């Protein structure tokens, strides 16, 4: 204020130099700054801050009797309240301005999804993550869940032509989901978008268990009624009174249910045990270091166990209570009779086609599944102001991806009368490191050095005759070394103080906010020295949001500079500074964490898949009492995993946080389908007719469960998030392939093995209908 205020401000801005580019930009090229940023730093734990609390989503609990919490979300709500609601237009006109038409800084290609732009928008990684999570939750609950229930009901009615099946299959599924996810929330487990992957598995297995059991009970009921009808014909022929053919006779219902429990129930038990043991791998910290993935593993274990118990108890009771009878469809049954003959009659053709696709999938496996997990705009719900503002900031300021490295001089101690970080050799070493880091493309850095260079002082007030002196230039002036030289009269004023004292003056000039964001705070009661105890400082490294693959190269280049000429003793102890007692860390922050999580997810997927295959082979060999059938079962599941890269390449699906867990889902449902087919083949016998009947009967149920699960997933096509839509499309395609693998490929492998073994042992063709009977005859005899 006062006379010359604007001139002084202009001088401050001019003195700041390139540092201003980090805070203001001219986006339309008219020479006037029109866009600026205010950078805020927040602590991880907000509980001791003075922000208003928000309601705890968990309500009043023993750990939180007030039902109120202070966290980042509460801070963001408070900041938004201060800016947009409690600010007065006369004090902050910008706070109430809204741009309804595109500005120069908008991405015009996304103009159709960008909301009306507030002139002041709170953005950054934390607000975006909260907004994305809330939007995904709203999409799933408000759009997908109602449509999913509707589509599942329609599909069940279309397949069974009886609305009662919706209650029989839907009730156990809903109970399982409530019990499982309720338990996860009550136990306060970490929840992330990855938990979405557990839903389709539990729904798929729930439908699978319920339909297999329901259809087998109905199949047994029909068989018992046919047997009684034959006996009635004999009684009628002999003139004796006939038995009542009531399908709900207690003895008939009991016989049908017990027989189903001993056959299909056995297969369901094998499936539940196998999938529980297989998914237990996701909970091993040695293989899965990522906590959200372990939460998925726990959810699956609890959910599968609950699904098995609830289905086995409730389905028979609901069938009897509702008096459910499946309306037969002669055309559908006839179609599956024909499909059942495919593995027997054209097994060579099936093997050739499946082998060709599998070989191609192996060829492109590393290319497709080895891709970096993306975080593109397609995976963000449209219309999020915080995301659009962050995208705009990344483009205009070439920043937004905030990284940093730590300089730690604690071991160096107090030298030259200053705190460790204030020591001039430390500051000079930081400047040298910044020069190297800034030479990396798309990279700029900010540190204490830049702040000291940007702040200019009136040297005349200090008794020193310099013009336009920055704090950095002042503490590096050569006159500090010549202050006692009589031949340098210009340096005599420097004798009244010392360079070290001037360094402290320079640092004390910085505001508490600047110092708190760049250095660790003074430790009251810990520090035993007169000078401040600043021992660490942050050097911020800014980059725009770019593809992780490209950003990974930049991260590697920066880390090479931070390692220096010698190797590091861990990520926090590198010697690039070249000073005793001073170390620096490797790069940390948003980009390195994203890259490490990306690598961790890929490694965990690979390790869990391999571990699951080995464990399931052992478990199924024991449960089936046949290593051969265990290998056949895993082969059928494995080909689906190997077909996934083909779908991703030709379907244009990328690897993102949603699709990253698809392999786990397919494994869970694929193993279940294959176990049911194998168990039915064991019941019917490994003969051409037995295999054909197993496919015709059990394969039909597998088709019904697949169709029902896909109907539920089809609701995902109506969500507004392209990344989620890709997830559900790929999920449905892989479930269909799992159906093909279990119902066609698996029986074909059994037929091919039997045929080859028979010929090698000199017994002639195994597919000899003269000895084993025709397929149709085999159906009737069974």
Residue ranges of model-derived segments:
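Membrane-embedded transmembrane helical bundles of large multi-pass transporters/channels
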Residues: 47, 63, 67-70, 78-378, ...
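Short flexible coil/turn linkers enriched for glycine and charged/polar residues
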Residues: 35, 399, 533, 579-581
């Amino acid at each position: 204020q006062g006379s010359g205020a604007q001139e002084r401000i202009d001088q401050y801005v001019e003195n700041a130099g390139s540092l201003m580019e980090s805070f203001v930009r001219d986006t339309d090229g008219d020479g006037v700054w029109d866009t600026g940023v205010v950078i805020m730093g927040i602590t991880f734990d907000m509980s001791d801050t003075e922000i208003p609390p928000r309601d705890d989503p968990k309500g009043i609990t023993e750990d939180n009797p007030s039902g109120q919490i202070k966290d980042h979300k509460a801070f963001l709500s408070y900041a938004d309240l201060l800016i947009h609601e409690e600010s007065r237009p006369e004090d902050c006109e910008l706070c109430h301005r809204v741009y309804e038409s595109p500005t120069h800084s908008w991405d015009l290609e996304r103009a159709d999804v960008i909301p009306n732009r507030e002139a002041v928008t709170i953005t950054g990684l934390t607000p975006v993550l909260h907004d994305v999570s809330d939007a995904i939750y709203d999409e799933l609950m408000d759009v997908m869940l109602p449509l999913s229930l509707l589509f599942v009901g329609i599909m069940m009615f279309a397949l069974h032509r009886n609305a009662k099946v919706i209650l029989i299959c839907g009730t156990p599924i809903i109970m399982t989901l409530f019990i499982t996810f309720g338990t996860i929330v009550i136990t306060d487990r970490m929840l992330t978008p990855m938990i979405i992957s557990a839903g389709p598995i539990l729904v798929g297995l729930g439908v699978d268990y319920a339909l297999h059991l329901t259809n087998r009970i109905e199949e047994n009921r029909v068989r018992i009624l046919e047997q009684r009808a034959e006996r009635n014909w004999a009684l009628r022929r002999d003139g004796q009174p006939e038995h009542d053919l009531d399908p709900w006779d207690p003895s008939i219902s009991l016989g049908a249910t017990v027989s189903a429990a001993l056959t299909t129930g056995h297969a369901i038990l094998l499936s539940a045990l196998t999938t529980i043991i297989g998914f237990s791998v996701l909970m091993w910290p040695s293989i899965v270091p990522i906590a959200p993935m372990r939460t998925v593993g726990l959810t699956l274990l609890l959910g599968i166990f609950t699904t098995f118990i609830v289905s086995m108890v409730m389905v028979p009771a609901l069938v009897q209570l509702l008096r459910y009878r499946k309306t037969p469809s002669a055309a559908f049954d006839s179609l599956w009779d024909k499909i059942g003959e495919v593995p027997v009659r054209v097994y060579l053709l099936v093997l050739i086609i499946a082998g060709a696709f599998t070989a191609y999938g192996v060829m492109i496996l590393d290319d497709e599944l080895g891709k970096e997990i993306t975080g593109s705009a397609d995976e963000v719900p449209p219309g999020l102001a915080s995301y659009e503002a962050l995208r705009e900031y990344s483009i205009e300021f070439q920043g937004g991806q905030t990284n940093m490295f730590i300089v730690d001089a604690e071991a160096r101690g107090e030298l030259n009368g200053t705190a460790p970080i204030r020591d001039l050799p430390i500051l000079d070493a930081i400047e040298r490191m910044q020069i190297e880091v800034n030479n990396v493309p798309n990279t700029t850095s900010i540190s204490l050095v830049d702040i000291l260079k940007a702040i200019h002082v009136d040297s005349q007030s200090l008794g020193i005759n310099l013009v336009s002196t920055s704090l950095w230039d002042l503490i590096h002036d050569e006159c500090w070394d010549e202050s006692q030289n009589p031949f340098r009269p210009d340096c005599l004023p420097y004798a009244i103080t010392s360079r070290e004292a001037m360094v402290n003056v320079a640092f004390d000039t910085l505001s508490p906010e600047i110092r708190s964001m760049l250095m660790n705070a003074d430790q009251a009661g810990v520090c035993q020295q007169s000078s401040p105890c600043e021992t660490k400082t942050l050097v911020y490294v800014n980059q725009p949001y770019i593809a992780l693959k490209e950003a990974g190269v930049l991260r590697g280049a920066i880390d090479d500079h931070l390692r220096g000429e010698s190797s590091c003793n861990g990520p926090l102890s590198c010697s690039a500074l070249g000073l005793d007692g001073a170390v620096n860390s490797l790069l940390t922050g948003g980009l390195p964490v994203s890259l490490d999580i990306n690598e961790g997810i890929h490694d965990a997927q690979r390790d869990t898949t391999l571990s699951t295959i080995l464990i399931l082979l052992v478990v199924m060999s024991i449960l089936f009492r046949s290593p051969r059938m265990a290998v056949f079962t895993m082969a059928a599941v494995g080909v689906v995993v190997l077909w996934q890269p083909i779908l991703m390449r030709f379907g244009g699906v990328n690897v993102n946080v949603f699709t990253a867990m698809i392999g786990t889902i397919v494994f869970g449902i694929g193993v279940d389908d294959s176990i049911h087919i194998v168990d039915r083949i064991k019941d019917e016998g490994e003969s051409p007719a037995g295999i054909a009947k197993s496919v015709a009967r059990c394969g039909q149920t597998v088709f019904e469960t697949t169709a029902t699960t896909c109907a539920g997933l089809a609701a995902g096509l109506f969500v507004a998030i392209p990344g989620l839509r890709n997830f559900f499309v790929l999920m449905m395609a892989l479930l269909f392939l799992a159906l093909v693998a279990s119902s066609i490929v698996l029986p074909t492998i059994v037929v091919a093995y039997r045929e080859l073994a028979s010929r090698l042992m000199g017994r002639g063709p195994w597919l000899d209908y003269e000895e084993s009977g025709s397929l149709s005859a085999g159906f009737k005899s069974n």
